[in-house]
Amino acid sequence: MARPARRTVRRSERKNVEKGIAHIHSTFNNTIVTITDPSGNAIAWASAGTCGFSGTKKGTPFAAQLAAEKAAKMAMDHGMRTVEVYVKGPGAGREAAIRALQAAGLEVTLIKDVTPIPHNGCRPPKRRRV
């Protein structure tokens, strides 16, 4: 009989990273905050969904604020002090997430909007009639 395979437990080792990049992906339905080191390797991430929100509540500025606070705390546990913020998307949680990063104790050195804008690419979805 085959021996059962041993489960390897991955421990998140403490990375000492002083500077980082906070990527805020804000859509109408959710906000995802990923904090990476300068080369782009993820250190911490959180979203409105992982903070316990569901449905339409995920798109609110308050949900984005909690997601940014959670990601900032995890990043500060790894020794992060300053971040550059790259914001992508049209969602409601853009400014709330940036303010939450500053309030959590991270020093924001740069705020850049990297929302992709098409040069008339795909046809957009039809207008909603409510």
Swiss-Prot record:
Superkingdom of the organism of origin: Bacteria
NCBIfam families reported in the protein's UniProt record: PRK05309.1 (NF003698), uS11_bact (TIGR03632)
InterPro entries linked to this entry: Ribosomal_uS11, Ribosomal_uS11_bac-type, Ribosomal_uS11_CS, Ribosomal_uS11_sf
Cellular component terms (Gene Ontology): ribonucleoprotein complex; ribosome
Function noted in UniProt: Located on the platform of the 30S subunit, it bridges several disparate RNA helices of the 16S rRNA. Forms part of the Shine-Dalgarno cleft in the 70S ribosome.
Coiled coil: none
PROSITE patterns assigned: RIBOSOMAL_S11
Name of this protein: Small ribosomal subunit protein uS11
Alphabetically ordered keywords of this record: Ribonucleoprotein, Ribosomal protein, RNA-binding, rRNA-binding
One Pfam family per UniProt: Ribosomal_S11
GO biological process terms on file: translation
Gene Ontology molecular-function annotations: rRNA binding; structural constituent of ribosome
Family from the record: Belongs to the universal ribosomal protein uS11 family.
Subunit structure and binding partners: Part of the 30S ribosomal subunit. Interacts with proteins S7 and S18. Binds to IF-3.
Gene3D superfamilies in the record: Ribosomal protein S11 (3.30.420.80)
